Amino acid sequence: MATSWGSILQDEKQLEELAQQAIDRALAEGVLLRSAKNPSSSDVVTYAPFTLFPSPVPSTLLEQAYAVQMDFNILVDAVSQNSAFLEQTLSSTIKKDEYTARLFDIYKQVLKEGIAQTVFLGLNRSDYMFQCSADGSKALKQIEINTISASFGGLASRTPAVHRHVLNVLNKTNEASKILSNNPSKGLALGIAKAWELYGSANAVVLLIAQEKERNIFDQRAIENELLDRKIHVIRRRFEDVSERGSLDQNRRLFMEDQEVAVVYFRDGYMPSQYNAQNWEARLLLERSCAAKCPDIATQLAGTKKVQQELSRVGLLEALLPGQPEAVARLRATFAGLYSLDMGEEGDQAVAEALAAPSHFVLKPQREGGGNNFYGEEMVHALEQLKDSEERASYILMEKIEPEPFRNCLLRPGSPAQVVQCISELGIFGVYVRQGTTLVMNKHVGHLLRTKAIEHADGGVAAGVAVLDNPYPV
């Protein structure tokens, strides 16, 4: 996948000058993070790491990823409403994975009491890599779907201008014009705004559940600002604040410091380390309320790796999406090989295959946030320890995707520009809103491309491994 700027990657002096221009433009555009040293303050900020050039992406695969996103929205929503499927699918996992078990306990409590909310909001991001076959052909393969705190929609809205600027500096105006416009933050905000509107209280606010130390604040502010432009107010609070000052009235309306809450938007609560006893209490309070949660706990469970693995079983998509054979075909075309590690013959066979050919598999726990997976020798060591234990049921095995590497230059604060062999991961943002049983919004709202050096097996931008990028359609 050659590009017309490949030769510049060998010119150190030109690269240095161009990198400085790109960094200045990124700062001017608001491609920003708080500093690692002081993540609670915006007094000192830095640019978010990014590629100097956009990276080549096959245009047919980009189109395919967009085309299937609304199917994934419908699928996630269907799974979240199917309590029998969730219970059956997660039954082995919750025996050995304490975090998933705690989420499931809250889910069961809310089901027993009766779900109070009538408006349901999904903001998700489906992530893919491009599998490269021996004959050079490429296929879109889903890595995962993020149903909680799907990030970088705000910063991804600001990076196209940076890459257009770089190419314009090089007099590559034709190439610059091919960089797609992209504004996920606007689309994500439209989903929140629709849920807020359907809740039906003009004075109610959106409650954003935030971490105390949040480097990625500007990503979140982009969505907040879009909402404020629509006269919808956002309050940022931590789980601790909800525990201390949140309450439900007799109709289970949620109040935060006497302000009624229409929508709860989680940008925290997706990893075990983000919960203590007080935070679990706060999560239960939020779930019991009639506010629209993004996501509600059923939708968070629908995004687990175990659910992803079960959805790949023959006949399951057909059962969940009856009468929709075209959608089923589009979805199934993106599935990589996924294998259960539940106790029994099927799980034993999967373990044996992975130990025999470790370079072909990835071991995945039920975790979000990046940097949790096991590869190669590390995977072999983990499987040797897990293979005879019921704990293995809290993991899944996935076929390892092998994309075609390409050269690009990675720009990171405090580091010299680095020209390396890279691979990319494409995310498509999806938004849906359901009122009762009626789907009132279902759309794709933009993309995110993240790129990393090939030696890094796992991890995203927040984990310090990948950098922000833009697709250059080829």
Swiss-Prot record:
Give the binding site residues for substrate.
125, 148-151, 214-216, 220, 267-270, 450, 461-462
Task: Tell me which residues bear N-acetylalanine.
Answer: 2
Which catalytic reaction applies to this protein? gamma-L-glutamyl-L-cysteine + glycine + ATP = glutathione + ADP + phosphate + H(+); gamma-L-glutamyl-(2S)-2-aminobutanoate + glycine + ATP = ophthalmate + ADP + phosphate + H(+)
| Pathway(s) served | Sulfur metabolism; glutathione biosynthesis; glutathione from L-cysteine and L-glutamate: step 2/2
Assembly mode: Homodimer.
Give the UniProt family note.
Answer: Belongs to the eukaryotic GSH synthase family.
Return the protein name. Glutathione synthetase
